[in-house]
Amino acid sequence: MAGGTLADVQSLARGENRPAPLDASGSITVSVTGAAVDVSALLLTAAGRVRSDQDLVFFNNPVGPGVRYAPDGVTVDTRGVPAEIETVAITASLDGSGPATFGGVPLRATVGSELDFPMTGLTTETAVVGVEISDADGWKVRAV
């Protein structure tokens, strides 16, 4: 793991907030693994809404303001996120090639090389918000 060893990784509990482990350039990468999933990012205003289609970053729209898609994850460059964006929500949805729901699927979000969020207790869900990266008195990560 770049930047840390397995022993350095801290687990997040559902609902827990932590300072975002930004790299030297102010970026953070979130990866979602454990099943064949489509990862997306929604750039949300304080009202919890996207401003336009550009605020939805996924495989068919791989670059948005301050956010770049990569298979199984996204990278958020906090310096490029517009001031009116309060939260970047990282989502995962089943891609149709595997199970029909997340019930029994071992799904986890890895934030940078320091934080890990095992998404447990899922049952009939086909899409989930895994983590949110928010700018509230400094960039924070919340396990949803």
Describe each model-derived feature in a short phrase.
Residues M1-V144:
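Intrinsic-disorder/low-complexity signal
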